[in-house]
Amino acid sequence: IVNQKDGTVSNSGFMDELRLKLNAKVMLIRNIDTCDSLTNGQTGTLMAIEKDSSGYVKHLVVLFDRPAAGKQLRAKNPQLAKTHPGGTMIETYSWQYSLGKTGTGSTATLIQFPIILAHAITAHKTQGMTVYKPKTCSLDVTSAFEAAQAYVMLGRPQSLEQLFIPGQLDTNNIYASSKALEEYKKMNK
């Protein structure tokens, strides 16, 4: 959202300053190429921060948790495979925002890497995600506050061996909605 008075952009999903460190857990926050599984929510590990001769970061290299993510892009850049096996190059992304009434021609452009740190993510963000072996998944189901939210969290790992639940498991936080249970009963008649 663009502030009409000072032109600042808020609620864009981007930070004023992106600070990353090698081996940090990261997540894409925009769809880059849906056919190549480079989609919003895809997680991985930062392998490299590549800079140009003047010291500016030209691209990042990420080893995605899902092996299929970025496979087509990696095939187009075989040189990268020699220096960073399995790594996918992520370049800056730009978004344009209108600064005034539509059609006035005033725009702002936001340029940043479409990545954030992701050492911890919310249950809602994990919906549809798979935690691939051998990675482990530490889940705090005590924070579940909606029906089926614990199910969304518990269903992410591929096996029980990957699952770690710290503290005491309170089964009161694991429940389905009454409407879902009614539908389930109808289907089983």
Annotate each PLM feature.
Residues L22-K189:
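C-terminal accessory regions
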Residues I1-L22, V26:
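Mixed-charge, Lys/Arg-rich low-complexity intrinsically disordered regions
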